[in-house]
């Protein structure tokens, strides 16, 4: 989060965030946009990546409140250029966030690179945040996009949680839900280890498995969630088959802390509820 915030606030231009499905990329971006909400920043959030270069420019211009309908690519570029220079003169920051950016065509990524040419001697007029899965890394490493790759000022990768981070995430979410301190016993260490074994620390799966396990335990009038209920939930969610194809990462222990990400995700969901 700190790296993304720094990249935007310091107007570094291109920033890339990658991670596997369900690791919390989109929620992390939502938290970032909330942090930027009161900092003279306006953003366009692009969700649909199956766009042509003209459609992308049209979408971005519309998100920034510009009249875009029926205009040519040249006209859209002129309008965006004037808009960005005007905001820069007022010391305002403009951001384009592209979600699922691995789906962008080479043509559109090149168009985005050309947008980054709009700059002063010291700063980029447009901050571009590319968010995507592992395939985005592969695409950025391709020969066709070597110029774009060189312009990326910051590049971050979001890993799944390790066991300790999974434990912290579960307990943090229990606190956010209003559970008393003794509610830690709802998920004993053995149960959390079972959750981790089935989910491999993927935040979305951790949340889904825990929610379903709590419902199952409640239906059986249990005061805590035993490991066998987690096993049953994992079976119902077809996670056992998933784990057979992708062996458990129980021995994986990374140096990057995902706990802060978990807290951001949990706080975001709590704020949304």
Region annotations inferred by a language model:
Residues 38-48:
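Conserved catalytic segments around the Walker B and adjacent sensor/switch elements
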Residues 62-65, 134-135, 143, 161-180:
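Conserved AAA+ ATPase "sensor/coupling" helix adjacent to the nucleotide-binding pocket
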């Amino acid at each position: 989060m700190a790296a993304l915030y720094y990249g935007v606030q310091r107007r570094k231009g291109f920033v890339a965030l990658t991670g596997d499905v369900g690791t919390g990329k989109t929620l992390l971006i939502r938290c970032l946009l909330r942090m930027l909400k009161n900092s003279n920043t306006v953003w366009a959030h692009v969700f649909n990546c199956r766009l042509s270069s003209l459609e992308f420019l049209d979408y971005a211009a519309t998100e920034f409140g510009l009249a875009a309908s029926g205009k040519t690519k040249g006209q859209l570029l002129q309008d965006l250029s004037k808009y960005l220079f005007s905001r820069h003169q007022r010391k305002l920051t403009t951001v384009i966030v592209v979600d699922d950016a691995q789906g962008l065509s080479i043509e559109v990524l090149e168009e985005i690179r050309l947008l980054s040419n709009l700059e002063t001697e010291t700063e980029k007029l447009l901050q571009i945040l590319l968010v995507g899965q592992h395939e985005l890394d592969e695409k950025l490493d391709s020969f066709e996009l070597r110029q774009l790759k060189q312009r990326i000022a910051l590049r971050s990768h979001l890993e799944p949680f390790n066991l300790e981070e999974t434990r912290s995430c579960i307990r943090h979410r229990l606190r956010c839900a209003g559970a008393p301190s003794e509610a830690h016993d709802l998920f004993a260490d053995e149960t959390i280890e079972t959750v981790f074994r089935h989910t491999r620390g993927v935040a979305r799966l951790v949340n889904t498995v825990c929610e379903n396990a709590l419902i199952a335990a409640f239906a059986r009038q249990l005061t805590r969630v035993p490991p066998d209920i987690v096993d049953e939930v994992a079976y119902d969610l077809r996670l056992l088959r998933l784990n057979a194809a992708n062996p458990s990462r129980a021995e994986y222990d990374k140096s990057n802390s995902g706990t802060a990400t978990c807290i951001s995700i949990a706080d975001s969901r709590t704020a949304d509820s």
